[in-house]
């Protein structure tokens, strides 16, 4: 596990964008695993700027997002479909048919989860997976638990995650209680992984990810078992290392 500590959020975002750009330049038909939340926004902005400057081409890239809220329409401003369109997809030349996000409105959730796994498999697997991390160490919506689902699944969100995400909604009561999330085994099959973290509220989770016991109680700690993981974090997130 490689840990890169940057001065601040902007420098963290720039470093992450450079690593993603290098992947796409070296392999134009890369399959990228993408994350949402506040942390990757700066990285997406940097990548969009690089595209505008003619430094990177996304026309052959395929993407798979980690998760989506269950029973939240894709046009809702809090949905990850909306997030990805507004923060990244509409700013670059990625083909809509090559972008994949779990269908939170699927009538048959189990079939949707199986289909999502099959799409990842048919694509050849994830070349580079981008991850954020929750204050409790969750990855995607893989919440701390006695055991974790290995593949894409429907998950009950913890109260801590609901409260953390309530800033995107009018109130905590409006936050969906369930989400569809790619599982940890699928995440760990990615050839390379980059995890981003910014802010002092992520410091304990980062410490446990880097040097804690490997445990499903801290899902991010499972990254210790992967041979190609890079953490890009700012000084505040690194404050307990």
From Swiss-Prot:
Per its record, the protein catalyses: alpha-D-glucosamine 6-phosphate + H2O = beta-D-fructose 6-phosphate + NH4(+)
| Name of a matching Pfam family | Glucosamine_iso
What CDD domains does the database record attribute to this sequence? GlcN6P_deaminase (cd01399)
Give GO BP annotations, semicolon-separated. carbohydrate metabolic process; glucosamine catabolic process; N-acetylglucosamine catabolic process; N-acetylneuraminate catabolic process
Give the matching SUPFAM superfamilies.
NagB/RpiA/CoA transferase-like (SSF100950)
Transmembrane segments annotated in the record for this chain: none
List, from the UniProt record, the residues annotated as the active site of this protein.
67 (proton acceptor), 136 (for ring-opening step), 138 (proton acceptor), 143 (for ring-opening step)
| A Gene Ontology molecular function term of the record | glucosamine-6-phosphate deaminase activity
The top EC class, named as a word, is hydrolase
Choose one Gene Ontology CC annotation of this protein and give it.
Answer: cytoplasm
Q: What is its EC number?
A: 3.5.99.6
Keywords from the UniProt entry: Carbohydrate metabolism, Hydrolase
Q: Which Gene3D superfamilies does the UniProt record give?
A: 3.40.50.1360
Specify the pathway. Answer: Amino-sugar metabolism; N-acetylneuraminate degradation; D-fructose 6-phosphate from N-acetylneuraminate: step 5/5
Role noted for this protein: Catalyzes the reversible isomerization-deamination of glucosamine 6-phosphate (GlcN6P) to form fructose 6-phosphate (Fru6P) and ammonium ion.
What family is this?
Belongs to the glucosamine/galactosamine-6-phosphate isomerase family. NagB subfamily.
Protein name listed in UniProt? Glucosamine-6-phosphate deaminase
Source species, please? Halothermothrix orenii (strain H 168 / OCM 544 / DSM 9562)
Lineage per the UniProt record: Bacteria, Bacillati, Bacillota, Clostridia, Halanaerobiales
